């Protein structure tokens, strides 16, 4: 099935998508992840989003025009840049192709796109930037449902995240928090705000405070360090690559992260979880040695993924070796003969399942034990366990339990440990089903997890990714059916996993899925219909 889906995703890229509808236009112009900023660099990187009412539209070339005044640009003259290429598909972080820029210089620019029919589209609306370093915080998401409790949790989370970002942008360098607090909020920052600039600045501040051995501090400017906080130095470059699509910044940080991990291995070569830095602990008493070995497993897993943007295919062998040794040490020390964990806390179960320390055949017993504990005791974790709870339930297919726990238990102190700790990430990626399967959301996986509970009847969400706006909206119908609408940005392909029984009838915009343009059925199971969608907006109806 995976190979079939991969072939289906690649097929339009290889043969070229059929163009449907109107010409393509550039919109959402930005510079180094900022809209009309006072830019931080004399070598700015320019981005735009493709807009078209047609389906399957793609960029084949681009024409960048930049001028020192709005009047010159309006006359279609580029005294700073006039770059025209008929074979340039880059639309995200396009390098500056004009004259050298100076600090304080004001630049007005626009772009037009050459599509697959070799037709130039209209000029974009003009944008501008000034060569000086600022930070601006703008929203990039929306979420609502019929359930007030979920909506209120979303609103509280957004207010908390926005307050931290705005205080940091205003000069309060402690506002984002420790490394642990930042990494727990990283995906939420990216999903809900144009947060690349402040998070990159925070990462640079962490790097400026590295110890001589290469350890990241607990927070910028501090001297202490530990396994929980230091993992921020690895997670932030990964997020820059995967969520913001910035492989150049991720590549730049490879030697820094590598020095840090090699220092950890040198201190604890047998990966026993030996205490390093300041002692760490959790609210439920999970031992620090257990935490150390699991968090090293997580760091190693992310490092293997970072090897792709860093272009380090040979060095990844080191981290495969680390992973095998970490796994063996964990299993020797913490797995009982019957396959259960010797540490019987919910945090211990969550870390074991998320941190690459178990073999696949060892996971189900740990999952069953965790689910049993959650059903009997409710949520019994602190901030570290909360970071992993909803992702683990999502990845193990326990979506109804995740919704039940959020709906029943997130109040008071329990709610507080989830605010800014992955809650809106779960709403957007699980409930709304918006996920990327390529860096920078160049390909999507739309997979809404619709709870069986009758309390939640519909969800509507959008995310303004670096590749354009992604929309997802599902609604349960009274007859047991489902309506699902979505928008896939121009230049992007999506894999859709639509909840539908095998005998259900599925239509898109009133047509069969075989007749609908831009829709390709890959396969159907007893519970799901899998499609590949070209760019465009779609309205599916599922009738039982």
PLM ranges: what are they?
Residues 22-54, 132:
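Pro/Thr/Ser/Gly-rich low-complexity, intrinsically disordered linker/stalk tracts
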Residues 184-195, 233-249, 295-312, 350-360, ...:
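Well-ordered alpha-helical scaffold segments within catalytic/enzyme domains
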Residues 321, 325, 404-544:
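Non-catalytic C-terminal accessory modules of carbohydrate-active enzymes
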Residues 137-266, 272-278, 385, 389:
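Substrate-binding groove/exosite segments of carbohydrate-active enzymes
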Residues 58-106, 116-122:
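Recognizes extended acidic, P/S/T-rich segments that occur
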Residues 96-98, 213-232, 263-331, 335-379, ...:
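The feature captures the catalytic groove of carbohydrate-active enzymes
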Residues 8-17:
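Bacterial N-terminal signal peptides
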């Amino acid at each position: 099935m995976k190979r079939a889906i991969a072939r289906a995703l690649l097929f339009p890229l290889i043969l070229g998508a059929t163009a449907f509808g109107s010409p393509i236009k550039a919109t959402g112009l930005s510079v180094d992840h900022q809209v009309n900023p006072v830019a931080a660099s004399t070598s700015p990187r320019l981005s735009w989003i493709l807009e078209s009412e047609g389906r399957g539209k793609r960029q084949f070339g681009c024409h960048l025009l930049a001028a020192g005044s709005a009047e010159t640009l309006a006359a279609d003259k580029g005294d700073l840049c006039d770059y025209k290429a008929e074979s340039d598909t880059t639309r995200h972080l396009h390098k500056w192709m004009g004259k050298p820029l100076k600090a304080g210089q004001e630049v007005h620019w626009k772009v037009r796109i050459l599509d697959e029919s070799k037709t130039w589209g209209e000029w974009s609306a003009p944008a501008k930037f000034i060569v000086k370093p600022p930070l601006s915080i703008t929203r990039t998401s929306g979420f609502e449902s019929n359930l007030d409790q979920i909506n209120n949790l979303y609103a509280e989370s957004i207010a908390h995240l926005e307050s931290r970002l705005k205080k940091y942008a205003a000069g309060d360098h402690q506002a984002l928090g420790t490394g642990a607090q930042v990494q727990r909020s990283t995906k939420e920052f990216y999903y809900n705000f144009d947060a690349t600039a402040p998070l990159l600045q925070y990462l640079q501040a962490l790097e400026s405070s590295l110890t001589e051995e290469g350890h990241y501090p607990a927070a910028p400017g501090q001297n202490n360090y530990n396994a929980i906080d230091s993992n921020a130095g690895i997670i932030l470059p990964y997020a820059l690559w995967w969520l913001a699509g910035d492989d150049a910044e991720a590549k730049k940080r490879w030697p820094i992260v590598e020095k840090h991990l090699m220092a950890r291995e040198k201190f604890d070569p047998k990966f026993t979880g030996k205490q390093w830095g300041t002692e760490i602990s959790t609210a439920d008493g999970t031992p620090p040695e257990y935490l150390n070995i699991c968090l090293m497993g997580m760091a190693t897993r992310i490092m293997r993924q970072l090897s792709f943007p860093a272009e380090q295919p040979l060095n990844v062998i080191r981290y495969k070796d680390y992973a095998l040794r970490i796994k063996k040490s964990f299993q020797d020390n913490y797995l009982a003969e019957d396959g259960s964990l010797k540490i019987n806390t919910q945090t211990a179960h969550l870390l074991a399942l998320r941190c690459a320390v178990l073999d696949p055949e060892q996971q189900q017993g740990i999952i069953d034990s965790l689910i049993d504990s959650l059903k009997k005791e409710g949520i019994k974790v602190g901030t570290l366990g909360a970071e992993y709870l909803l992702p683990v339930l999502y990845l193990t297919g326990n979506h109804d339990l995740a919704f039940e726990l959020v709906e029943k238990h997130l109040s008071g102190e329990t709610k507080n440990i989830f605010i800014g700790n992955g809650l809106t990430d779960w709403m957007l990626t699980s409930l709304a089903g918006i996920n990327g399967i390529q860096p920078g959301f160049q390909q999507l996986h739309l997979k809404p997890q619709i709870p069986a509970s009758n309390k939640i009847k519909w969800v509507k969400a959008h995310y303004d990714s670096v590749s354009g706006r992604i929309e997802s909206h599902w609604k349960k119908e009274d007859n047991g059916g489902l309506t699902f609408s979505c928008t896939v940005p121009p230049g992007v392909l999506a894999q859709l996993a639509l909840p539908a029984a095998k005998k259900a009838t599925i239509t898109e915009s009133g047509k069969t899925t075989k007749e609908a343009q831009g829709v390709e059925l890959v396969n159907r199971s007893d519970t799901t219909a899998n499609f590949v969608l070209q760019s465009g907006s779609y309205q599916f109806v599922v009738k039982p």
